């Protein structure tokens, strides 16, 4: 990571933050893509040019709930400090309440996606340990897992 003023550059595949890290800022992507994953590696979404990520934990003042990785190319972003986000929403209590509720729903949705993926993984492992010929069911469950991994739910 290279930082100058409020501009940050991450190299391809560089870890931006991990689950459990403290949250003092959000980021506005200027160039490149950032991928967001659950703690167990389920892809939740991809954030690109003109989009913000990291705002949920920053607004809610919690540790990071997802892992953020730079994409295939360099990522350029502008850092948005916590106090700037707070100032933006402080002036409008209705907007602040809407944002907070939306962020809580997003966290819940991310957890549900991870739970579903974990359930499917468990079923696949059980099927793989059996000597029964149930390839069709197994292939179908693998397809569901791939679809879940490609869902576009953004933090």
Model-identified regions with their sequence ranges:
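Regulatory nucleotide-sensing modules
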Residues: 1-39
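Short helix-to-loop capping/linker segments positioned immediately adjacent to catalytic or ligand/cofactor-binding
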Residues: 16, 87-88, 110-113
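Cyclic-nucleotide recognition modules
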Residues: 46-103, 107
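Phosphate-/nucleic-acid-contacting segments
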Residues: 119-155
